[in-house]
Amino acid sequence: MSKNHVCMSSCLKIPSACLIFFCFYTIIILHKRYTYVFKRKIIIIFGLTLVSLLSHAQYDVSFSHYFDMEPSFNAASVGKQPKLNVSAAYAIDLAGFKHNPQTMYAGADMPFIFLKTTHGAGLQFMNDKIGLFTHQRLALQYAVKMKLFGGQLSTGVSAGMLSESFDGSKLDLEDSSDPAFTSSKVDGNALDLAVGLYYTHRNWYAGISAQHINSPLVRLGETNELKVDATYYLTGGCNIKLRSPFLTIKPSFLVRTDGVAYRGDITTRLVYTHEKKMMYVGAGYSPTNSVTVLVGGNVHGIVMGYSYEMYTSAINPGNGSHELFIGYQMDLNLQKKGRNLHKSVRIL
């Protein structure tokens, strides 16, 4: 998992003695994660290096297991199967570095029938911490589904709250009396909206979505503000059965952009299934960014996956990213009212 951008206004002043350390640390972190634009004056800490970083950063987090976490970027994918779906992921970026990015995600979704129409509902929470910044999102998701061309088309919306905070009290600066610099902890909230379309047809699927369509503006204290740009996603994948009835190849892709920066991921997994057992190995590639290896399987009905991402970009800190994924699914019988809706546990 690697991460990317934020647009923020602020004003800081860094003593020259700390400049070299902060510049080196910031270049490494921000190349993978965040870029900040400031309202009153540009922070000396970032210097001219931010000019190039501005074109390579995005706000949203990238997960290696995106194929099993589609509700995290497309609300229309909630309830895509007649199952209760629960997933969680924890990722450590730039392992070994102090204040390195750490992200936790948890979500659940399920379908339901209302007025003879299939709908989907979901809930998700994300906590993303990098350095002195903490980004949180709590959102509700809804989707309505209809049959189309032999498949199923789903239209979804999401409404949630972004919570942003910056703990300036932990910075060690000589000139903390500068009124333009935030030396205390500040936080703020803003409404966050998203929309999406998702289509499934037998052994393939495709989806398109837009996150942060209202471009949330979070005010942090009296002088700082953080603006999140809308981000657009395109995803797809399929199942390719091999001669062996136990083996399936599952290629998938995810492309996203905010109109300035972009990231693409291509992943292929070889999946072995037999009765209730499942194991997989896979590899992913993000052009100009990283190469990822994945491995996983199910244990007592719970799917566990691990991935390691190795950076291939010009600015390479030497340590990669670790990601752990956990998923659980339970079959639902949507046709029987007033009865126990679950039948059995299935693997992802």
Give residue spans per PLM region.
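Cleavable N-terminal export/targeting peptides
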Residues: 1-60, 331-348
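Subset of outer-membrane beta-barrel
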Residues: 58-348
